[in-house]
Amino acid sequence: DLTPAQRFEMKVVSAVLPFRVNQYVIDELIDWANIPADPIFQLTFPQRGMLAPEHYARIAELLENDADKAELDAAVAEVRHALNPHPADQMQMNMPLDADGKRIDGLQHKYRETVLFFPSQGQTCHAYCTFCFRWAQFVGDKDLRIASSEARQLHDYLRDHREVTDLLVTGGDPMVMKTRHLRDYLEPLLRPEFDHIQTI
């Protein structure tokens, strides 16, 4: 059993960073006799050290004092921003533009041969890992989220960029999507016009 202190620490951290675990992990993978040292527990349950001491103290104080939702939300937003949710200006620098100069949502073209695609239907995982650097995708803030539900934009971009050989479907676990969504994104890539795409 988790102690009240451990539960509170998790509450503090999960106010800022996403927390999700599934029954299989809880029942089959965690050695509950070895908490908190169990590696799968460490991998999936929020840990106090995930936040800087000053961030932890600020959120803990608000929770202990039953701060109103608006005050807590504002503090959480400030802490998230301080955590640098999108390093290296990836929301600006790596976002490709269409022929009209408009940003194509849900794509990143960071490397010459590789395009990252963030399908909106795949922006979750069965369990969130504590080391995940894509946490901004899961916190419910659409300003932090990179996502697209436009298969056409993906296909148009790949058709126009023959230097791209690799498509990385990411953001969360794409295998949580319904098959029909995954098919809409990937099946057209089997056509000859996409023969430059070698790895998905």
List PLM regions with ranges.
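Flexible, acidic/Gly-rich N-terminal and inter-domain linker regions that tether
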Residues: D1-H109
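Conserved, mostly hydrophobic/aromatic
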Residues: V25, C129, I200
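Active-site glycine-rich loop that binds ribose-phosphate moieties when present
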Residues: L43, A99, S148-D156
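Ferredoxin-like iron-sulfur electron-transfer modules
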Residues: R103-S120, D141-D143
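Glycine-rich, often proline-containing surface loops adjacent to acidic residues and nearby aromatics
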Residues: Y111-E113, Y128, E163-L168
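Local cysteine-cluster metal-coordination motifs and their immediate loop/turn environment
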Residues: F118-A136
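Core AdoMet radical
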Residues: F133-E150, H161-I200
